[in-house]
Amino acid sequence: MPGFLYSYKKFREEVEIPAVQNSDEDAMKRLQKMIRPFVLRRLKKEVLTDLPDKLEENMFVQLTGEQQKLYDAHVKRMMLMLDKQSEEEFKTSKITILAELTKLRQICCDPSLIFADYKADSAKVDMCLNMISNAVESGHKILLFSQFTTMLDHLAKRLEEEKISYYMLTGSTSKEKRAQMVENFNTDNTQVFCISLKAGGTGLNLTAADIVIHFDPWWNLAVQNQATDRAHRIGQKNVVNVYTVSYTHLRAHETGAYL
């Protein structure tokens, strides 16, 4: 419909500059209202009617022992740091705060990620390995996602101890090796594919797997869903079970941290 969005000059003056350069929400809402009748959104379940179901479940675990002590100590240190800051200091220290929240998330994954001398257990790791062992015994293939490549390295060592075969895909994996591993996983007897969420969340077809485990939840659910869709896509013949491993009763939930 030529002219529906005005001439480019008028569109730029009334929509583009206010919305893009000035972050004018009203201008953006006006544009959305105008184009909404012309936007067709099709859901996967409407297009792929023969695609097996996707069953999602949150698996909750509690911190215990030394891991709980480290978590509490880090939260206390963060609170003291924030209490000492003025409003202006808080505005300029957001990167530092995010870094501290990342450390908190790593403690929840496995304290050994930031404390080299930590030798105690991780409740999350123990639960995850138990889930994988049970799934492997039942003949399933698993996609295991984490945002931390160091966490994937740690999980890989545990898989080796349990004599569970795996592939590993991170941002450093070459394009050629990436393609070869995907092909192999879909045809051989390898049981687990450990994947960095950012490196492997899109562009992979891994329908040999029918179990997906998100070891550390991400704040952007759409990113997690894209990762899940590496298995839940055209070519999948089985119901896909998706598990997100989280801690319960953590103060960090109140501060918006996803653990």
How should these model regions be labeled?
Residues 77-84:
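Cytochrome P450 catalytic domain signature, combining two hallmark sequence patches
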Residues 222-235:
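Conserved SF2 helicase motif VI
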Residues 170, 215-218:
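Short beta->alpha connector loops at strand-helix junctions that form conserved
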Residues 204-216, 241-243:
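A short beta-strand element within the Helicase C-terminal
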Residues 1-45, 236-239:
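Conserved P-loop NTPase motor "coupling/switch" region that bridges the ATPase
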Residues 199, 208, 217, 236:
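Short, conserved catalytic or interaction motifs in soluble domains
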Residues 49-72, 86-204:
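Conserved Helicase C-terminal RecA-like lobe
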Residues 248-255:
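Conserved small/polar residues in nucleotide/adenosyl-binding loops
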